[in-house]
Amino acid sequence: MNLFSSFTLMTFSILLYPILLSFTDQYNNNLFPNHVKTSIICAFLFSLIPTLMFINSGYDMIISNWHWMTIQTLNLTMSFKMDMFSMMFVPVALFVTWSIMEFSLWYMHSDPYINRFFKYLLLFLITMIILVTANNLFQLFIGWEGVGIMSFLLIGWWYGRPDANTAALQAVLYNRIGDIGFVLSMAWFLMHSSSWEFQQRFSSQNSSNILPLLGLILAAAGKSAQFGLHPWLPSAMEGPTPVSALLHSSTMVVAGVFLLIRFYPFIKNNQLVQSIIMCLGAITTLFTAICALTQNDIKKIIAFSTSSQLGLMMVTIGINQPYLAFFHICTHAFFKAMLFMCSGSIIHNLNDEQDIRKMGGLFKTLPFTSSELTVGSLTLTGTPYLTGFYSKDLIIESANTSYTNAWALSITLIATSLTAIYSTRIIFLLIRSKPRFVPLSPINENNPLLNNAIKRLLIGSIFAGFLITNNMTPMSIQQMTMPWYLKLTALIVTILGFMMAMELNNLSLYFKYKTTSQHVKFSNLLGFFPSTMHRLFPNTNLLISHNSASTLLDLIWLEKSTPKLLSSTQLMDSTLSSNQTGLIKLYFLSFLLSMLMVTMLII
């Protein structure tokens, strides 16, 4: 086990080398991005050794070698939890990041601040690894906030664009809502046990309390873009494509799901919390799949597919299968990163065009990228024997084993069929149809940095599911029998989705609607959620605040209470006391009244 811990710490040390190098003169060198890529390659190779040792032994290990401080009865230490989740996730994250870094060398080659960009990407990965390997809430919170800060810096990388700045702020604000739940949960754990260590937390008797679990659900909903806190995820597409690939595959968006997986010993004993997670995930996976149907921005379609898959992971946790949720995290990383990199290649070759209606016929002009985009889309839908099939099929099978999951299962099956529909739509509009882009676009995909990066992820999208299935503990699963129609549910639903997509494509060639239907508007406008939450409620609050300030403060207090009251009182007094009006009728009336009074007095 000493060798195990040594290689693990060596992996982390290799990743820190480029960060330390950035404080020297080498940071301004053009070779700094290559140093970062080489460090990630070495870290990936070193991480395979402790992973294979763990697969062989199957024993968890905790590395605790630095005591930071003691606050009364609270001990803050830096400790790493080397269990199945961390040991399987770290090589996957490093492998995917290796490909993204190599892709970034091609995609960001003309950026004047490419060295800083690579440094931020590396910090993004390091903070995610800190989150995954943390053995206490304090260290996990460092990684949690780290991925949030780095996402803000990377989403707003092109800070000269107002949309990028807005998207970065939106990501921070929505995640702040989730952070409130995380901080409150940390405070509850500290008050009731005086410890943030996972071993002490899981062995305590307070696991039945629902309050900290609700805080963790809120935190996971914010970080993993669940329904209600989801608008920041498609808006984050304003960042560079390598950022989108890393953010959606193996870093920030899966952090919320991983948080619930890490705290699963609490969740498994609380059926109400499991039901909340299952319902939240089911609503998210269906709503975002509906939104993806009519989007025209290729990156936003893939972003909504990510949110839909995150909802599926939440459903998996809700049906008492955290290991399957983690398995789907690992398989999802490969094909989602490949989809973003393929879309980035297409966007780059078409002069930053992202509208799929202005593409088409790319199989002849970009055959390599188009082929891998097709494979990635098929993997996303759960095509048999590709990586996505191994996890999605098991999830739907597990949901089929209990009638209590019928509601979530039905919604998940509908979302799975919709996944096949919008994936087929991408394939039809980008590859099969006629070219609709500017003919003068300089198209060239013959770059080894681009091709090698996507090839590695293509191999992962085909074989990673099989490899992880056969090396993920437990090695053998309990035998069970079920009807053949339940076993083939995922495949049947996917085929139905493909058939529906083909039928809709044929109908669109012959039928033209004069007006857009309300259903299409609901999908295209994201369920009217941004216009409601970002416009209606803020404008209503501003209007109420403006009217309250102008009516209550200005008109009543400042005008009628002090200066205007004095002026009106003085005007009334002066009017009553003054008899010089200049009107002959009033003078004659006053004369008559005076004569009348004198006459009455004499008589």
Curated annotation (Swiss-Prot):
InterPro entries: NADH_DH_su5_C, NADHpl_OxRdtase_5_subgr, ND/Mrp_TM, NU5C-like, Proton_antipo_N. Its EC number is 7.1.1.2. It catalyses: a ubiquinone + NADH + 5 H(+)(in) = a ubiquinol + NAD(+) + 4 H(+)(out). Keywords: Electron transport, Membrane, Mitochondrion, Mitochondrion inner membrane, NAD, Respiratory chain, Translocase, Transmembrane, Transmembrane helix, Transport, Ubiquinone. It holds the Pfam family Proton_antipo_N. The chain crosses the membrane at residues 3-23, 39-59, 87-107, 117-137, 140-160, 171-191, 210-230, 241-261, 272-292, 301-320, 325-347, 360-382, 411-431, 457-477, 482-502, 583-603. It is found in: Mitochondrion inner membrane. It is a multi-pass membrane protein. GO terms for cellular component: mitochondrial inner membrane. Core subunit of the mitochondrial membrane respiratory chain NADH dehydrogenase (Complex I) that is believed to belong to the minimal assembly required for catalysis. Complex I functions in the transfer of electrons from NADH to the respiratory chain. The immediate electron acceptor for the enzyme is believed to be ubiquinone. Belongs to the complex I subunit 5 family. This is NADH-ubiquinone oxidoreductase chain 5. It comes from Glis glis (Fat dormouse). The gene is MT-ND5.
